[in-house]
Amino acid sequence: MVTESAVSSKSSQLVTKDSITLTINGRRFKFSVGDGTGDVSPAETLTETLRKRLQMTGSKESCGVGACGCCAVIVNGDAVAACMTLTVELDGKNITTLEGLEDATKGLDPIQQAFIDEYAFQCGYCTPGIIMVAKALFMKKAQPTPDEIKEALAGNFCRCISHYTVLRALNKLAGNMNAELSTIVRANDLVEDPIPIAQELYPSPYASGHVCKRSLD
């Protein structure tokens, strides 16, 4: 586990600037660096800066060690774990968060719309991170293959088990209409030890068609 002290030790070796400038969703933000009131601490993570300073709460924090993907944002075209990225390391970088995807004139990003169309979420906590990782992939390749989509999302975990509909939404968006869903994800892939539950994916009556495992009784 990466502790605050470990991050602080790393950051103290990196920071030599009195201020940093970040471009977030097309807007420039300048912060002073230090330990004073209002300063960005050398140990402050991007998740903390986004959520606490800028009230951009799309990036979620769950594991805090870069293992779940909930906090993902895009930095200079690449998906990164915001909870493991020090804000002071991002001077001069371009950052895109979930809040920056929707276009004022065109509406939702195609990936966001695909998730809505396919009900590719349940509680929604992990959804922003999944969308941002998918966005980074689609920015690099407009029509990724099913395997490329799975590989890109390997670090994203959904505790509600909505992986099936996530993959379906992204494969449809990528034009992989002929991809067999059974080759994209199998029910047994979703849990290590599927105890007495139906070995089939059913629409959840509680989540407007979101996909989940459901007991036969």
PLM region spans:
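Signature of N-terminal electron-transfer/Fe-S-associated modules in redox systems
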Residues: 1-217
